[in-house]
């Protein structure tokens, strides 16, 4: 019997349906899984015909799966004028495509269990993520449907990474200024990468494995990140990604135009919003929980921490821009910035890989 691990807030999540301002049936190409597709072929009557006409078949040449065709306004054709799903209304929730049932939930499978989470792109999920206080809490349950399939070596390697991530969680929630915390996380990640490499590729017995202290062991990640040259390069990288919605481009170009002022006034912003600094702790924890264990696939431990640091710092950068532009950062504005970042970055693997590889310290050279 395996386990399922979830953030403690996971069980509180409820889709707000037609009240959502960022409808996940608008602007997203929604794939149709094979089981749902097979069922939809059997639905009778006028609705069945309209349902099938709304689906673009899979393309064997490109590998693109079957998906709902978006209309001219980039809406799912089965989203009615009240922003309610007609599949749900006509056939029931259990007949919705798998991605529609799951979103914004995501799942990561391991040798003897699974981790579930909620994506920051959803405003109801973002509300829960930002609201947490104190150290991150998780619910772990045994699950009949999750089997133990891994080898002892695979499980051991996973446990090493889980332990490393727990250490990062503790650092992320320390009562310390954001920059000090970011520097400690970066240095810890550098040490963890060395430990992980030693585990995977141990030195032959008798060979000296001690290494001299490197610049990365002592460098200030925050000092390097908050330089105008670094932020200019980073924003240009973000603007070069495929952009889904214009509000994201507007945020990035606005921030880029005011970088000197953002850098100069950032400490004033952090002082003014000191009561909400736990939100950045929560974001660090969220990005670490969602992405760190992917190091099992590429052994890039440090890159996963870099992704969490850059992601959280970019959101903070946009918060400062919002504060300068409008005189305040409302709770709703913070949710909008977070969900825009997640929508534009986290659901494109190329984007996350490039941000994870973006070398902040190299920008100082």
Provide a role label for each language-model segment.
Residues 2-20, 55-97, 114:
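Immediate flanking context of iron-sulfur cluster ligation sites
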Residues 2-22, 111, 124-126, 130, ...:
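Long, low-complexity, compositionally biased intrinsically disordered regions
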Residues 17, 21, 161, 165, ...:
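Short runs of predominantly hydrophobic/aromatic residues within well-ordered alpha helices
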Residues 22, 26-59:
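A structured, charge-rich N-terminal accessory region that forms the first stable segment of a protein
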Residues 83, 90-183:
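Internal, well-ordered alpha/beta segment that forms a basic, Gly-enriched binding/recognition surface
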């Amino acid at each position: 019997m395996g386990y399922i691990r979830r953030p403690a807030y996971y069980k509180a999540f409820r889709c707000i349906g037609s009240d959502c301002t960022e409808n996940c049936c608008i602007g997203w190409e929604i794939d149709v899984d094979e089981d749902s597709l097979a069922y939809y072929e059997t639905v009778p009557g006028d609705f069945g015909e309209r349902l099938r006409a709304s689906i673009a078949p899979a393309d064997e040449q490109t590998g693109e799966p079957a998906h709902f065709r978006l209309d001219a306004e980039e809406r799912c054709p089965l989203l009615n004028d009240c922003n309610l799903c007609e599949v749900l209304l006509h056939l029931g929730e259990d007949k919705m495509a798998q991605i529609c049932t799951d979103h914004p939930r995501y799942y990561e499978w391991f040798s003897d269990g699974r981790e579930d989470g909620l994506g920051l792109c959803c405003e109801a999920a973002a509300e829960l993520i930002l609201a947490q206080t104190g150290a991150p809490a998780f619910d772990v349950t045994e699950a009949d449907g999750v089997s133990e399939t891994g080898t002892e070596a695979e499980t051991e390697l996973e446990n090493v990474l889980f332990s490393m991530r727990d250490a990062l969680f503790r650092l992320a929630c320390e009562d310390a200024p954001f920059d000090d915390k970011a520097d400690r996380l970066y240095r810890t990640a550098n040490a963890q990468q060395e430990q992980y490499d030693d585990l995977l590729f141990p030195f032959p017995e008798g060979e000296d494995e001690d290494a001299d202290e490197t610049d990365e062991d002592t460098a200030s990640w925050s000092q390097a990140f908050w330089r105008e040259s670094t932020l200019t390069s980073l924003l240009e990288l973000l603007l070069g990604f495929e952009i889904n919605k214009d509000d994201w481009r507007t945020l990035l170009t606005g921030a880029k135009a005011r970088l000197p002022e953002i850098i100069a006034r950032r400490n004033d912003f952090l002082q003014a919003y000191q009561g909400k600094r736990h939100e950045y702790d929560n974001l660090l924890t969220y990005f670490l929980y969602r992405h760190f264990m992917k190091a099992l696939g590429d052994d890039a431990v440090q890159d996963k921490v870099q992704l969490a640091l850059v992601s959280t710092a970019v959101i903070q950068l946009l918060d400062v821009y919002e504060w300068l532009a409008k005189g305040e950062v409302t709770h709703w504005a913070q949710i909008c910035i977070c969900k825009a970042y997640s929508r534009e970055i986290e659901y494109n693997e190329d984007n996350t890989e490039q941000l994870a590889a973006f070398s902040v310290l190299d920008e100082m050279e």
